[in-house]
């Protein structure tokens, strides 16, 4: 009732500076009322901050930054004598917040002089994290005379200094690390946390460090807020405040759980509800009927544009109607007026770049070389070759063997990520065994790719059942989803509709993480088939998935007359024969089931949807192929497909990918804690209080029963199920089914349950001994919770903080602070590496993947598909550079090894000269003017690309004499003006460019 009550209060006289609401949704609705009816009042919206006193705020970092930004806006408006109000979820107002003096900003102005050391110190005391690379809010970096700053709740900027003078201020794109062209005159820099100087910073730091709080990072980011003392205010006590009835209920509930003392809220004025004032929820299809019923009141209809207005309603000229083109969301009625909005809230998605650098090469990690196999990357090292200095990667192989890989050939190696249950073994140099293994894998891949292409060609000749995909009922079906489709879902639906309405049978793969909306897309296709008079089959590998899909489809199709039935091992024999008869007679529209479906006779089957096809056995797959030969075929998979493989596969089948999480899905809240009994009880009770379920990951079968006993001692009557690899498949499925039904509260398992299973009620995951898991493992585990509308909680538990090395601690802290969802393909890709992804194409290849590594395997598979389908084959970049030229990215220009390594990798992957030019621009933008050694390395990369295009295998020189060796063993000689590095490179570049020009003619 927030909108109608607030509208009434505004009309009676309203002089409050804070409105406390139940949650963010209610706050958003309240802000719309104030912004529309009182545009002169500055309304500042706070986020939710569901942190309890003394919680580690790293887990709430993004919301905390937004809250501080909103508070600073409020203080500035007050200072400017502007009428202003904070509209906030009650959770953001429960704790004292910083006074104005702690949120002061400072300015940097073009052409003014600054001491860079003082600036660095100031940013540090203001809470900025000083790093090599600026990627997310609250970070800064100093590289010589170039300073990057990412201001919280704002943008990133790049400042260039010359002799202490600020020479340029430009906006920075953190995704590309490039600055934008336009120069700015000035920027204002607020604190990330608090505007402190050295003494006040040290004072607060001491208070935090001496506190008894349990955390891995006792710093100001984690706990500074709780120790501000007199420098913080209870906003509700200081400013005129009013609270919504639902916010008051929230406070009373928290008080009943002993989570806060409600005494201090009793003095607050409560926003009154009144008779005749009511918030509305009207569906667009019921709009005209509603308007006709209320002809006695003045109705204001708001819409984003005239087109939507005209398409939504035909009675715009009624005497009591007023139409307003405005973006506000207002839906309420009063005794004499009604406001209805055709607008919806736009969720501003931040373009988050994952801070979890999963593709980064780190010393000590396993790598696989295209020709020499599996080894360990030891270090980035400089060596003298032919009297010139060059950078190399040192890779350790079996025995004491070492390979020095020139950095321009970094494309020849990839990270070798093994599944958690296997131990990698180094290859031996010089035996040629790895090349033999590769040849074996290639032969198998050509066979697999051949079968796929043959099947695709066969299907392409079959005429499909053409369907009308533009029916009005499909739009009505979409509008009843109860949520907005993501752009990826819209695109996938359009692609499937195009297939269904063509004359060919559809063969499409729909891939996307669990909870990203694959089933909704499939249901749209099933409903389309139903409207066109066809039956559909949904085939799944497990009874649990059949049960889940049956419940989902039954509920979704309830109001649309679609008859849904299920066939699995739980259906009684007597019922089964009746069901099969009904399917044959066409009395069932959608049949859902396991492989039991495969022998079923349908009256008019038009669409077959298969979920997690790669989990079926060989015989079942053959039966699937037979049944689906002449019908539209949609395969769904939660296994992510790397982008390049996706491109190769799209030559032979349709591929749709869902990469965007639903708009209302939040990232899981992550906590890193030292394990103790009290903490375990608190975590479990917190989830049970909201009637949820818990995953408890304990990756050791031998001691899993002891963990169960301990949990039962801590919380008697706790219903716990155990699941691990030694329990047989049927029993495992039984346990999962019982857990999905809610008959267990905790699932105690060695690793997480199957990826394709959606368990929206399990929203807390506890990971025992988190230090023993890899980064991508942990991110994948965390992604298993928070998939419904409830927020997910993830706890990384460590037995003993002192036993952690610095690297492990850094890795875990990075995960705690960065909860971004689906942080790009790198997570999906590594997820696949961890899970094996062995039967991505329907035949188990996990043995081959284990031997040669996932990256090399997918690259070889792409090549096999291109080769057999007549596509463009990848150019091999195997030019050998034996030039006596010093060329490397100079550490004086780029001090960080990891940044240099990243640039080396990207340069080695360049396919054309333009890409090298772009990286050249980027280096100068990020690090300053390029020196000769660095520029010469980029020229070496350019030479490699040109030589590759001309079929040259080797470039070498002796003094000023240069030799070019071609693939047909032909040799060509050139003479440079001198043996200077510059002359050698210039002579070669000039000659190769001329050769390319001749070739193009």
Curated annotation (Swiss-Prot):
Highest taxon listed in the record's lineage: Bacteria
Xref: SUPFAM superfamilies: CarD-like, P-loop containing nucleoside triphosphate hydrolases, TRCF domain-like
Molecular-function annotations in GO: 3'-5' DNA helicase activity; ATP binding; damaged DNA binding; hydrolase activity
Location of the Helicase ATP-binding domain: 499-658
Subcellular location(s) per record: Cytoplasm
Enzyme Commission (EC) number: 3.6.4.-
Positions of ATP binding: 512-519
InterPro entries per the UniProt record, alphabetical: CarD-like/TRCF_RID (IPR003711), CarD-like/TRCF_RID_sf (IPR036101), DEAD/DEAH_box_helicase_dom (IPR011545), Helicase_ATP-bd (IPR014001), Helicase_C-like (IPR001650), Mfd (IPR004576), P-loop_NTPase (IPR027417), PriA_helicase (IPR050880)
UniProt keyword terms in alphabetical order: ATP-binding, Cytoplasm, DNA damage, DNA repair, DNA-binding, Helicase, Hydrolase, Nucleotide-binding
Gene Ontology cellular-component annotations: cytoplasm
Record GO biological process: DNA recombination; DNA replication initiation; double-strand break repair; regulation of DNA-templated transcription; transcription-coupled nucleotide-excision repair, DNA damage recognition
Motif (DEEH box): 611-614
A family per Pfam: UvrB_inter
Entry keyword annotation includes Hydrolase: yes
Main location: cytoplasm
Annotated ranges, domain Helicase C-terminal: 679-835
Function summary: Couples transcription and DNA repair by recognizing RNA polymerase (RNAP) stalled at DNA lesions. Mediates ATP-dependent release of RNAP and its truncated transcript from the DNA, and recruitment of nucleotide excision repair machinery to the damaged site.
Similarity-based family: In the N-terminal section; belongs to the UvrB family. In the C-terminal section; belongs to the helicase family. RecG subfamily.
Protein name: Transcription-repair-coupling factor
Lineage, top ranks: Bacteria, Pseudomonadati, Campylobacterota, Epsilonproteobacteria, Campylobacterales
